[in-house]
Amino acid sequence: MEMKNVKLPKEEKIRLVTGKGEWNVNDLGGKLTSVRFSDGPHGLNMIDENGNRKKATIMPSLVVLANTWNLQLARLQGETIADECIENGTDVLLAPGVNIKRTPLNGRNFEYFSEDPYLSGVMGREYILGVQSSGVGACLKHYCANNLEFERYYQSSEVDERTLREIYLKPFEIALEAQPWTVMCSYNLVNGVYVSENKWLLTDILRDGFGFSGTVVSDWGAVHSPYRSVMAGVDLAMPEAVVYEAEKKDYEIHDLNAALEKGLLGEEALERAAGNVVRLTEKVAAADKQVRFSKEQRHENAVSIAKEGIVLLKNDGILPLKAGKYCIGGTCAVKPVAGNGSAYVAGDYVQRPLHELFRESGKAIEGKSFELWGKSSSSHDYKLLAEEAYSADGIILCVHGYKEGESFDRSSIAIRHRQEEYIMRLTELYDNVIVCVYEGSAVDMSPWIDRVRAVVFVGYAGEGTNEALCSVLVGDTVPSGKLSETFPCSLADAEATLGHGNGFVIPYREGQFVGYRYYDTFRKDVLFPFGFGLSYAKFEYSDLAVVKRGETGYEVSYTIENTSDLDAKEISQVYIRDVFAMVERPEQELKAFSKDFVKAHEKKRVRILLAADAFAYYSIPLKKWYIENGDFEIRVGASSRDIRLKQSIRIELPNETQVSQS
């Protein structure tokens, strides 16, 4: 093997396809450029050789980033984190994750974008472009169908091919347009085969189908059989020489050298894997690394993204806050919560308490904080708040749910019991209660939603959380975030959560009906629909036009009018419905969106091009994407349940053009 001027004997090729230590590629004693990996995706999570975690900017979690529906901000987040990768010697950031939020119980939902494959894919694509524009590699993960943390090392996602293609592989296919340097294969099995040993997924689809030409890296410890993984398409097993105890009964099978000698490992496969690792080192060596932002600017970037990612879910006219005095309850108002695991970031920015930010807002708003449910809190804190509230203009409760993080799933989607109890007690005494929810995924608010005046979904919004929230509450920022996932009325309404199946087998019985595709198709009531979010401004939609462009494309245009006195941003969403489908299809599917700034009392014409694949489904008999002739409905709305405009079109294609190139 020869890569440029690098000649490698068989022994060095074998060393190359497993990592060096916990985080590095084997540089073969200096023969190759060293490559260092570090975790993300909400900021650099890097542990040095002494076990110390580097300090970094805590960016909003991907759920908050997705709630912005802003592609420019997705790119900005990637650029911002790349700066700190450069400053700390990280060459490849292990992010982003584009796994679908199949169930609200997944403990890592806060690390993923959406329940929708299109939104997940395009946000992931822009994030990758941001990271790599600075000369740092991105790692697209966790490929694929890794949608629970429950027994993640051994669970098998049992999913039919059409569902796999349309829902779980589609976000990867879209994000791969950004050409990430690496893709990470996941821990789980798909239909009984470990992803790390699945040639159909890693080679036939990822490389031959999607055209990925970079390096396939295993998740840390996901390789059970080194030679089988190399044969399937894994290039680099991380970390160094990890083999599970259960497999050690026949260790020589896992020894790549022995497998090569026995003919179990083909020389061509080893050549491919080692070559892809060498090419990764060459990318690192050739990278033009550029730091864009100062430390202060990175913080401002975090705040800017958080402002657009906060979602106003309910408002009975109490927001924005008027001048007055407000009691603030909850530890999140002082120190916001965040998820754990690989996405943990050790921040060095000291967040300001919400009441201090109120005081400095210039809006004559005063706040006083009460801990309520922190470690040192007691019923005494509640009594103090209740007494103080008699002379206050309102109560702001900052609540959060049960622990979220890597390697475990949520036990509930409700907020913690004592917090719910205090909401119930305080709303019995006072009318003006506002609830701010700091959570990483869907929350069941049904027991108390009708008792409060306003609800703000803050999410895990990073080190700028309270600055962003204050700006929204006092009206300096007009909220523009919308939900990137459906909030069901209760956990029982979430079809995909009904049991873990039989042992380690997870049946995807719902098929393609994930998230709003399920709720909208089967007319299920929801607490808040996909794409929903309120604003202080008001928008009207009008004048939908759909014009054919080329043989299979369509231009969709419509007008958005801001009828309020406030300049604001609106997220409009374009859905497609196959009216008389020959196969089972959802009620509607998101195919495009636009986030537009519209000045008060002005209009904006939005134009979106829909390519042919927007109308396609995956045909099992044809083994291809197929566009069905017939009637389709173009829908434009403010959410999946708030469709403002509709227009029917008829597609009539000759047989030779009916197969999409997707």
Kindly label every feature range from the protein language model.
Residues 1-617, 626-641, 653-662:
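Glycoside hydrolase catalytic-domain context in secreted enzymes
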Residues 620-622:
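Short beta-alpha junctions and helix-cap segments that line functional grooves
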Residues 643-647:
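Extracellular and select intracellular beta-sandwich modules with Ser/Thr-enriched
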